[in-house]
Amino acid sequence: MIQSFTRLNVADNTGAKEIMCIKVLGGSKRRYATVGDVIVASVKKALPTGKIKKGQVVKAVVVRTHKEVQRENGSLIRFDDNAAVILDAKREPVGTRIFGPVAREVRYSGFMKIVSLAPEVL
């Protein structure tokens, strides 16, 4: 469950290491984001040689949350961290590699490129 001011790790090779959620997209009063949701975020930590710089405002899709997500079959899935993948204007990933596992809910949200780049889909 991601809300404003939540800090997330970046699970791709764009050069950004940590982002902070500014807004959850999808409705004027929407408060929380979960796996597969798109957020607007500010880059808080970044590598100096990366594509994304510190202070830049980006869109990202949440791929892992520490708060468990209930699936339709009743099972729960939870990760050790909150993580996101940075997107461009066409909602395609900016990076060329994804690090760590990705939840299956990302596939249902229509981010097939992220699912194909991920080393593991849980």
From Swiss-Prot:
Protein keywords: Ribonucleoprotein, Ribosomal protein, RNA-binding, rRNA-binding
InterPro entries assigned: Ribosomal_uL14, Ribosomal_uL14_bac-type, Ribosomal_uL14_CS, Ribosomal_uL14_sf
GO CC annotations, alphabetized: cytosolic large ribosomal subunit
SUPFAM superfamilies associated with the record: Ribosomal protein L14
One Pfam family in the UniProt entry: Ribosomal_L14
Listed Gene3D superfamilies: Ribosomal protein L14
MF terms (GO), sorted A to Z: large ribosomal subunit rRNA binding; structural constituent of ribosome
Residues annotated as signal peptide: none
GO annotation terms (biological process): translation
SMART domains linked to this entry: Ribosomal_L14
Similarity-based family: Belongs to the universal ribosomal protein uL14 family.
Function: Binds to 23S rRNA. Forms part of two intersubunit bridges in the 70S ribosome.
Binding partners and assembly: Part of the 50S ribosomal subunit. Forms a cluster with proteins L3 and L19. In the 70S ribosome, L14 and L19 interact and together make contacts with the 16S rRNA in bridges B5 and B8.
Name this polypeptide is given: Large ribosomal subunit protein uL14
Organism annotation: Aliarcobacter butzleri (strain RM4018) (Arcobacter butzleri)
Gene: rplN
